Regions:
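Active-site beta-loop-alpha junctions enriched in small/polar residues
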Residues: 47, 94, 144-146
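Histidine-anchored nucleotide/phosphate-binding helix
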Residues: 31-37, 124-134
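Short catalytic/ligand-binding loop motif for oxyanion handling, primarily in non-cytosolic enzymes
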Residues: 51-54, 122-123, 149
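Short, charged, surface-exposed secondary-structure boundary motifs
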Residues: 98-100, 149-153
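Active-site acidic carboxylates
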Residues: 1-88, 140, 155-162, 167-170
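A short glycine-rich beta-strand->turn/loop micro-motif centered on a GG-aromatic cluster
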Residues: 113-117, 136-151, 171
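Internal catalytic-core helix/loop-beta-alpha segment
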Residues: 70-121
């Protein structure tokens, strides 16, 4: 069986930094357990911006500097990063376009499970990107291992993914 877990953007700035929430802090132990007990390969994405972030389209719409390469906020949460066995997939947009190449290199994939932050931005973006390129692979979102910008937007994102034939578990 070739199952993959994708841990999306579990970075300090999204947990308790510039864009942190109490919901994000609360899922860290759950995500740690998920990683420790996952029977397959675990991949991590990492939101990565440069000093010119505020000049980018995203920066103009979300004018909060975050996940600037090399900063403490950019780092994957220490207790999760300690479990990482592969290079993090750095991404400069909500969806990791380079994730497709990483997944294409896998010999066999039976399912892909997602967890992480933020449900309503980067999790849903990466789930839908993966769904577009790998429509026959079952995709799963572990809702207990996700948090959104707000609880309502988290729920909205979960519902949107369900409509797109993504299995949502542990709501």
């Amino acid at each position: 069986m070739a199952d993959i877990l994708i841990v999306v953007d579990m970075q300090n700035d999204f947990i308790d930094g510039a864009l942190g929430t109490k919901e994000a802090v609360a899922i860290v132990p759950y995500v740690k357990g998920l990683i420790e007990n996952f029977p397959g390969k675990v991949l991590f994405t990492r939101d990565t911006h440069l000093e010119n972030y505020m000049d980018t389209q995203e920066g103009k719409n979300l004018p909060v500097k975050h996940c600037i390469r090399g900063t403490e906020g950019w780092q994957i949460r220490q207790e999760l990063d300690a479990l990482r066995k592969t290079e993090a997939i750095d991404k400069v947009t909500f969806g990791a376009s380079n994730l497709v190449k990483v997944l294409e290199a896998e010999e066999r994939i039976d399912s892909i499970t997602f967890c992480g932050l933020c449900t309503d931005i980067c999790v849903i973006s990466n789930v839908m990107l993966t769904k577009a390129f790998f429509p026959e692979i079952p995709l799963i979102v572990d809702a207990a291992g996700c948090a959104g910008v707000t609880p309502q937007s988290h729920e909205n994102a979960l519902q949107a993914m369900k409509v797109c034939q993504v299995k949502v578990i542990n709501e």
